[in-house]
């Protein structure tokens, strides 16, 4: 957090020197969004603080886009005029006199100082548009967890803001096919979390939520030759859909089962992509472990889904395998420890199913190399996520 605050101070200083500098506007907004994400993950800081930072970031990004758009239009016009002048010169060009040559050489010697200014391109506009979608995604994520911190007008405001972004996509991407997937993924991630916020606030029903979520992730640019990143994002969205329905005490257990099964399929496909990054591969295993525990949770009341009951032992066994793989592949000590602890949990769930015994929390905690306090916090997180029943005594 200290490094982010130092970066923010530097960018804000640059912004004071030149309030209309597009780079300074963009960079300041990016750091504000990153700080907001850190605050959202910190239970000791009110989410309202994150909300303020994100609103400021959106204002800066909006201003940045407007300036970039204007500069691009100016650049295109200048290029057009320069081409016209060049064409006219070619028609009237004559060999320079000796005196003209001496003047040109003198000018060349005098004009040694110049400033290089990076031109604004369509890529610049795309970068800013994607950043805006990402900021809106973070904002909606916070609202799904703490809807009470914002007035009721917030979601309609976000929808209106995002509709302007969507309208811009065809204009700025028509000659940039290599950026279309990136734009579509940032939009799909945003749509998913906006729908989740709408569902939790009662403005969107489960059927609409699922239908529009699916539509966002099945666009040709995402579903055809999908990357590991797009498939992992789709799987995360499906898991979030399951969690949203679970939080609403929905009786749509079959819908949740199908969504989680689809998430596992997406993650399996992602893991088989040739050349997949090891960090992404580790993520596919960790998320498949989670998805299998979520599927197992459907066997418990009040869902009591028959397919989950029938396959409970296999689901917990699958989770154990995926968590162990994730622990081996993960690059950081913390990630390894989390996956390892979840693997132990899955093993004890298998014991519980086969022997009909209570879950041995003490044995799970003692298996952790990070200490009992850390292990208990991890188990509480698993309960909060719905990976373990809320009735579990910790």
Language model features: what each stretch is:
Residues 1, 19-39, 69, 74-85, ...:
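Amphipathic alpha-helical repeat scaffolds of TPR domains
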Residues 1-10, 34-120, 139-157, 200-207, ...:
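Short coil/linker segments at helix-helix boundaries
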Residues 2-6, 20-24, 48-59, 120-131, ...:
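Residues within HEAT/ARM-like alpha-solenoid scaffolds
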Residues 10-24, 62-78, 94-127, 164-183, ...:
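Flexible helix-coil transition and linker loops at the boundaries of alpha-helical arrays
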Residues 48, 75-135, 149-153, 340-342, ...:
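Non-globular sequence segments
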Residues 199-211, 215-224, 233, 237-257, ...:
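Long C-terminal extensions of eukaryotic subunits of large macromolecular complexes
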